[in-house]
Amino acid sequence: MKEYDKCISNTENLLRINPNNSDANYYLGLCWYNKGLDYDATLIPDPTSKTYKENKKKVNQMFEQAMPYLEKFRAARPDDKERWQAPLYRIYFSLNLSDQLKKLEE
């Protein structure tokens, strides 16, 4: 069973104690990212549907929640590309953040 909310709560508590804990930043970002991916996977693709568009906004909001934590992890551990690159790429692509996307591709 996926317990994203529990993971989010626990890692937020860790970050209150030590905001620079790179692993806690990574896992909090990853929780939000995976929660967004899982929610997105439940949607029936219909770009003309108002409900679909609203639900895609929810996915993007989860990605927006994930982004600062994954970026903080990236700044702390730039050589750990295999952990931060794919999630950030997907987030930047989904949120249409072309400048950030280009920086990842450099």
What is each stretch, according to the model?
Residues 1, 29, 34-45, 94-97:
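Short coil/turn linking the two alpha-helices of tandem helical-hairpin repeats
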Residues 13-14, 73:
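Canonical positions in the second alpha-helix
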Residues 17, 76-77:
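Structural marker of alpha-solenoid helical repeat scaffolds
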Residues 21, 80-81:
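Residue-level recognition of tetratricopeptide repeat
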Residues 24, 83-84:
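TPR alpha-solenoid repeat register
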Residues 34-69:
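Short coil/linker segments at helix-helix boundaries
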